[in-house]
């Protein structure tokens, strides 16, 4: 059996906890392709003895850790016999070991009784020395009411909240390093995403689109299922934005158009927020003043999970979640800022620059023409 532990879920109210556990069980079934997943108090169990399945389960949002365990009854003698045999198979000559025992429920023995008696039997059976500080092998015994579980490895999980427990948001994906990381961080907090990529063709080649979709496919691997993705034609609108008389506002105008498109998709999909990869001060459009001018274009919440991260931290996380290598393949995600881009745009100045462009209707038309895809996880 695989033991699945969760962290933050255990702090919720009884009703919320039950709801989140149910969602986590459904997500585990989808990720593992195993229907036999059930809950016990404070734990979820999977009918598998595969370490590969335990690793997969550890990559499901909401999971704190997993272990492949041997299940036995809760009688002390049965535990000691099974755990001694288990230890003999895993402790090599010269190894040191420690027994870590814990118990939930009413029993005639304590956790200390298990640790002391099992330790003595393992010493007798293997000749190994006890080292409680830095052992070569740890033998864990977890007694939960009428069952006990014996294991030697704890696989760290991704943590967070079960995907789908916190509603839906539109993730604005550019094809760069930052936006997939931002989307992943919100997925880890339980947010289901719909992706939106604005395709600047013919100003850039096909590689930009391909790179964005590859990044979404990596995110789909974390979802363990397809991500609905809108690919909207942005080239004609972008060309006109680059021609505005107040050319220093180019980056701000571009972002406002992207946000408008995000709002249109959110309304179609019942999403309640947008997700962007902005980091304060990283580029011209991400100064405090410019973000203020950009935000006023829509009335939806905008989640910026990377706002306080520097580039090195973002790159490190991108490598950890597997999106970095696809985000650095050759492509032109952005045509580059205008010479001397404005860093302190006022909302009034930006709105004046947009006059006559009919952006509301043109962006709505872009989204109506969007190609709607189901981006599957990479094999």
What kind of region is each of these model predictions?
Residues 176:
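Conserved G/P- and acidic residue-centered "switch" motifs that form tight phosphate/ATP-binding loops
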Residues 56, 333-379:
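Flexible helical/loop "lid" subdomain adjacent to adenine-nucleotide binding pockets
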Residues 192, 272, 324:
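Residue-level detector of anion-binding/catalytic polar loops
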Residues 1-170, 180-228, 296, 344-347, ...:
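RNA-binding accessory domains that recognize and position tRNA/RNA substrates
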Residues 117-122, 126, 154-166, 238-239, ...:
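Active-site adenylate/phosphate-handling loop in enzymes that bind or generate adenylated species
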Residues 322-330:
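A short alpha-helix-loop-beta-strand transition element characteristic
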Residues 216-244, 329-331, 335:
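A conserved beta-strand->alpha-helix junction
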Residues 171, 195-197, 231, 276, ...:
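Structural beta-sheet core signal
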